[in-house]
């Protein structure tokens, strides 16, 4: 990626999204050779993923140009929307103070959740829905009205705790 004029920030964004995709059960897929676990030789800023038991493909594009092909869904990730977070993480990592360790862990967790909640889980739900697979057991796959009913039945303390889990729950809890 560095050879293609990439910056450190783009590398961090791509590697983080890639790690969250793998952690969620996705595998890399090269649509040209129909091989799994393969990086495309054309470009490393457009990655294609699938699930082990699925033929559908989701594409992630880290550039502005469109991806053409037979994808279930394509997501374009604008690195500029994540660069400020990467800069914050890099700044915190440079600190030598021990008390910053908790701060670093917290920021990395927030970064991970942001990628998981905003990109990966919606892709997973969409791919499962469109290919007929059973949806993953997650709150996000429930209809909005049902989510509201569930939240209404919870005590305020529990709603406050749920609001810390994801941005979607935080928005719903407010």
Swiss-Prot record:
Note the Pfam families from the entry.
F-box
Looking up PROSITE patterns in the UniProt record yields:
FBOX
Ranges for domain F-box = 136-174
Q: What InterPro entries does the database record attribute to this sequence? A: F-box-like_dom_sf, F-box_dom
The name this protein goes by in its record? F-box protein At1g70360
Please name the source species.
Answer: Arabidopsis thaliana (Mouse-ear cress)
Q: Kindly list the organism's lineage.
A: Eukaryota, Viridiplantae, Streptophyta, Embryophyta, Tracheophyta
């Amino acid at each position: 990626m560095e050879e293609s004029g990439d910056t450190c920030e783009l590398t961090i964004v791509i590697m983080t999204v890639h790690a969250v995709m793998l952690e969620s059960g996705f595998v890399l897929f090269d649509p040209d050779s129909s091989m799994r676990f393969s990086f495309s030789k054309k470009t490393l800023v457009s990655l294609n993923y699938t699930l082990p038991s699925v033929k559908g493909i989701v594409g992630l594009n880290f550039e502005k140009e469109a991806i053409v092909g037979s994808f279930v869904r394509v997501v374009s990730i604008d690195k500029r929307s994540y660069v400020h977070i990467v800069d914050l993480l890099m700044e915190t990592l440079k600190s030598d103070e021990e008390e910053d360790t908790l701060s670093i862990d917290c920021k990395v967790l927030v970064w991970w959740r942001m990628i998981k909640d905003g990109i990966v889980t919606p892709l997973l739900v969409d791919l499962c829905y469109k290919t007929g697979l059973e949806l993953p057991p997650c709150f996000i796959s429930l209809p909005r009205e049902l989510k509201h009913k569930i939240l209404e039945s919870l005590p305020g303390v529990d709603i406050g705790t749920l609001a810390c889990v994801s941005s979607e729950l935080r928005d719903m809890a407010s």
